[in-house]
Amino acid sequence: MTESNRRDISWIFALLAAYFVLQVGVRLATSHSLDLDEAEQAFRSQWLAAGYGPQPPFYNWLQYTVFQFAGVSLTALSIVKNLLLFISYLLYGLTARLVLRDKALVAIATLGLLTIPQMAFEMQRDLTHTVAVFFSASIFFYGFIRSLKQPSLASYLIAGIGIGFGLLAKYNFAILPAAALIAALSDARLRPRIFDWRLGLTAAVALVITLPHLFWLKDNLDFATARTLEKMTASGDASYLTQVAMGVSSLALAIISFAALTVAVFAIVFGKSLRPALGSGSEWTRLLERMMLVFLAGILLLIVFGGAAGIKDRWLVPMLFILPLYFCLKIEAAGVETGKALRRFIPVVAVIMIGVPAALYGSVAAARFTGHYERLNRPYAGMLEILRKQAEPAAILAGDSLLAGNLRQDIPGVPILSADYPGFNPDLTSRRPLLLVWLLPKGGSEALPPDMAEWLQANLGTSAPEASVIDVPYFYGRGDDRYRFGYAWVNQPG
């Protein structure tokens, strides 16, 4: 091993910490408006529940807790996400250090996560629940590998925490610990680590963490799973064979989308030595191979027997996030010299660390030149500021959760309901005036949406009030481009 490979790897974590601080700054500088998942967190922070709908509640619980101390703000949202991502990378690096001797490969494996588009770009853009899955998977994977190599009460406890958090992050997380269990049981040398009394602690911790949500899930199974199943099985009137073909092809495309850039980067960095390295192996590469095979087999079962027709690349995060580490284990097993590879890898990482924040900011700011607007260009705060000059609302009914969450961060002391989410329905009988706000589709009707009119009639016995329209300049708007909102008042004073 070269001298450069022996040096301490703490610089990796310092670099990542600086990167995620930069991401917080870029997010705050880009726009005050919230995207879909951010708005969902702001909206649902008005109440604490054992379950909220199609997504398990881990991220909601975490964000609710932070909001109680820090207030509802974009800053709190961005810090929570990037702190979770930093901890995930940190745990991934610690896991790599457990199984890799070459410190250069530890660095490449850890920073290699940035070569996965779903990890580096999509998680910054939105996808809060996928961030929670990655965080949970990193905890579990560290606890699992440590339990196999350096078993202790703490390692089994960490694995249990990871499983508990993961099941509260996304239901498909269950495939990961199942794959790990089957993969370890199939190796006689690792089997004693599974038939260990401390595994009972793992199961107990996971059960305690998930128990409140499991009680809720028992009574709300259809509500919790209907939307996900609808997405997975959206094959129209296709025949069974067509549905299976759609599912398998979508899985193949998802794998390519997830892994292609990482494979390309490793091919560039290691050159001709990569291909023979992929034929090498160790007990750790064989373990990871079995885990990935079991995970993919589980998804294939969902396709063949569960009717899944559309597999999304982000659904592969609980397993395929191990790819950079897997490649590095292969390379170490082949005895490839890594000093030059690390020097070639660092510029790639630098391009990603600069390019991703620039792309995130540019996708919104470029609207002033292109006229193409994202959700973050919408001027929710400007609209609310104008309407509050007409009257101070005692409560707000928004047309959807995206709008409700954006309003919530600017007027946190007022109950905000959403017409598309019946789970939060406080008594508004004595709260007047009530402000109704909705998004106006291009070329659509300016009248009060039917679902909001139905809500008023069902909950307040009130007929639809007169609707008005307000238009507000976009963030980074081109020329005089403006975004239009519909609004109405119920019992406006004066």
Swiss-Prot record:
Domain of life: Bacteria
A Gene Ontology BP annotation from the UniProt entry: lipopolysaccharide biosynthetic process
Gene Ontology MF terms in the entry: hexosyltransferase activity; pentosyltransferase activity
Gene deletion effect: Cells lacking this gene produce a normal lipid A structure with GalA at the 4'-position but a modified LPS core structure as this gene deletion results in addition of GalA to the 4- but not the 5-position of the outer Kdo and nearly complete addition of GalA to the Man residue. The mutant cells are also more susceptible to deoxycholic acid when compared with the parent strain, and more resistant to the polycationic antimicrobial peptide PmxB.
Pathway: Bacterial outer membrane biogenesis; LPS core biosynthesis
InterPro entries according to UniProt: LipidA_mod_glycosyltrf_83, RgtA/B/C-like
Membrane topology according to the record: Multi-pass membrane protein
UniProt protein name: Lipopolysaccharide core galacturonosyltransferase RgtB
UniProt organism field: Rhizobium johnstonii (strain DSM 114642 / LMG 32736 / 3841)
